[in-house]
Amino acid sequence: MQTHEIRKRFLDHFVKAGHTEVPSASVILDDPNLLFVNAGMVQFVPFFLGQRTPPYPTATSIQKCIRTPDIDEVGITTRHNTFFQMAGNFSFGDYFKRGAIELAWALLTNSLAAGGYGLDPERIWTTVYFDDDEAVRLWQEVAGLPAERIQRRGMADNYWSMGIPGPCGPSSEIYYDRGPEFGPAGGPIVSEDRYLEVWNLVFMQNERGEGTTKEDYQILGPLPRKNIDTGMGVERIALVLQDVHNVYETDLLRPVIDTVARVAARAYDVGNHEDDVRYRIIADHSRTAAILIGDGVSPGNDGRGYVLRRLLRRVIRSAKLLGIDAAIVGDLMATVRNAMGPSYPELVADFERISRIAVAEETAFNRTLASGSRLFEEVASSTKKSGATVLSGSDAFTLHDTYGFPIELTLEMAAETGLQVDEIGFRELMAEQRRRAKADAAARKHAHADLSAYRELVDAGATEFTGFDELRSQARILGIFVDGKRVPVVAHGVAGGAGEGQRVELVLDRTPLYAESGGQIADEGTISGTGSSEAARAAVTDVQKIAKTLWVHRVNVESGEFVEGDTVIAAVDPGWRRGATQGHSGTHMVHAALRQVLGPNAVQAGSLNRPGYLRFDFNWQGPLTDDQRTQVEEVTNEAVQADFEVRTFTEQLDKAKAMGAIALFGESYPDEVRVVEMGGPFSLELCGGTHVSNTAQIGPVTILGESSIGSGVRRVEAYVGLDSFRHLAKERALMAGLASSLKVPSEEVPARVANLVERLRAAEKELERVRMASARAAATNAAAGAQRIGNVRLVAQRMSGGMTAADLRSLIGDIRGKLGSEPAVVALIAEGESQTVPYAVAANPAAQDLGIRANDLVKQLAVAVEGRGGGKADLAQGSGKNPTGIDAALDAVRSEIAVIARVG
């Protein structure tokens, strides 16, 4: 029975029983505690907890699930998968244990003609929670199971939760006996290889708290109603119904293995365990990668993006270990599409994008693997030569930091060479790097990293932001901070306030000044005293949020004095705010235009907007074409000129998303959100920033450029409003100047410049040819005039200026070839560009037999010209910075050879 038929029978069975069929949710949900959806019931959690009323009493679904904690076990065993499909039926206060058991038993044992799976009832076993006598009784009544085929187990096995606080309850697992060839008799407590778990019925009745293990957590109490949550692994039941040994032989994964075997020209499952592991890694990870990309994840360096990157890189490396050097990821994605397409049509519809992203990661990683592998081989060899068995944390960190090697890849490669890795040392270096980054960020934001001084004010309540409605507000100073420390409350004229010339932070109870967030930088403005302190005035240079609720104004006190408790006037610079709103609204316009031109997968990855300028980062593989860039600019400006109304309103998060409002991926939002709408459906986003009231106020938007800022992430930069006009005026002036200099009309400038560039390149080529011909002539003369020191022929010569290291390597090979087979050494040094002094040394085999090493001689050159160098016995090179030492350097080489040749 094919997998798509297995899925259809499951859904049909429960729909006939009155359940509502619910589509699979994305594997990514807006839950900061959950990296990926890992169970079928996740999308129903609010119903189980009583937080929302379910629109149906019972439901059925087949949910895409991803679990990655056991990623290193994938392939080594045949039981682990990172992606799986969980078929489930759910009851929200409707039926309970009896109903769940009756429905499951019917589907498993009914004949194929009756819509069931036709399993042999005599081969079905179950387990129950150790004190669940009711479940034992029901299995006996409903299914007629004998007591010996109902086994009791503890909390770790038969009490289910998601692993985080939420719904939980005792469970009953259903197992199928695969026969004596898979293990000993005695039920699942004896062998879970022979007795394969195919279905788990969870009697969801409690709520759990925090915990550290599968058994160590507190039961908080009963749920508002008793629920049913069941999960049948589609891959597991397919294994049984297709009568194969493991999930890798089902119709879901075997096609991927066959694709790999065809390309590798090696058979799978012929007794080579290491190769079989690689086949299984490729099959599992390719499928998971396709699902992740399909659901909007792009390769990255943290979070979900890092998981995807790690999966793809394990695929690529496993393929190389199978002898596949050619690109294969595109073929793998196509095979996954063909195998999974009947169940997940989005993999077919979105295949071009999925394949493009996966192949781009393959291309990038191949470059990383080539350079990083060389370093790994060097450090592994060095470690072994020293007699050590552990690769240092420092080396692992260098591989990660410089070459992008995940620690997991280093661990795998080390294990293959018989080495361990100092993971503790590596993680300490990583933690130190993160600490430095955090400290730098905190220092940039607050000039100090300790935010505990603000705790009292944070606990007292939030700053009221008035800036959506007014640019000037009366406020009270709640606190004054200097260098991260709160200034004690004092009276005016008493030391301790904030006086003229000081740089301090003021916390107000209300403010119209926008605090940096959402990509929009902080407002600039003033804070002025009132009444007896009206002489006080401060310029606001930055505004930041503490704990998302407290506005901290960084100010320079220009006159007078501020004291905690003072009433002040906080005001935004109107010109600044006007520019800021243009920049932020322009960002929304560009985002909408990108999605219109490229499609909905151009997902925002970050932004920055300030008066007159915007920067927008988005997930996309490969550069935009000139036509696409022009289109984005045109669509943006057409929307600006359309004078769309900009409307802002608050809405419940679920309703806002249902309306199509775009949320920033990975961002955590409150239940009630602010929605910014521009031109009805043209742009609808969740946003807490300040905006223009109609799009015409944005002014022209000029895209400056589009570039890559990382694998799979592109950046668009643009000028907005007056800055756009100024930029265009500069461009016009530049073009006019070029046209005047070239004595052609403006429209002919590009062709004339192209012609000049072509002529210049031809001239440079000819100059280079003449220069190298001259150098080679000098090399011939140098070889002819080689001096003899003992029985060694030596060419030690200063070359003409402007020579590069590459030039010297080329010449040194020519000269060495002309010196014959007797002992010979060539040392060349030159004055390079920008005061560099490149040098190179070569020693032929006969010279090496005498003990002359090029890498030793290059050190003699390095000392005299204050340089560094290295290489091997036959060829070494380096570069110095003191051209006055060139003659001394050559003399040092002559002296060293004289010593070795024992001359004089």
Swiss-Prot record:
SUPFAM superfamilies: Class II aaRS and biotin synthetases, Putative anticodon-binding domain of alanyl-tRNA synthetase (AlaRS), ThrRS/AlaRS common domain, Translation proteins. It is an enzyme of class 6 (ligase). PROSITE patterns: AA_TRNA_LIGASE_II_ALA (PS50860). Keywords: Aminoacyl-tRNA synthetase, ATP-binding, Cytoplasm, Ligase, Metal-binding, Nucleotide-binding, Protein biosynthesis, RNA-binding, tRNA-binding, Zinc. Binds 1 zinc ion per subunit. Signal peptide: none annotated. Gene3D superfamilies: 2.40.30.130, 3.10.310.40, 3.30.54.20, 6.10.250.550, Bira Bifunctional Protein, Domain 2, Threonyl-trna Synthetase, Chain A, domain 2. One of its GO terms (cellular component) is cytosol. One of its GO terms (biological process) is alanyl-tRNA aminoacylation. Its EC number is 6.1.1.7. It is found in: Cytoplasm. Zn(2+) binds at residues 584, 588, 687, 691. Its cofactor is Zn(2+). GO terms for molecular function: alanine-tRNA ligase activity; aminoacyl-tRNA deacylase activity; ATP binding; tRNA binding; zinc ion binding. Belongs to the class-II aminoacyl-tRNA synthetase family. Catalyzes the attachment of alanine to tRNA(Ala) in a two-step reaction: alanine is first activated by ATP to form Ala-AMP and then transferred to the acceptor end of tRNA(Ala). Also edits incorrectly charged Ser-tRNA(Ala) and Gly-tRNA(Ala) via its editing domain. This is Alanine--tRNA ligase. It comes from Mycobacterium tuberculosis (strain ATCC 25618 / H37Rv). The gene is alaS.
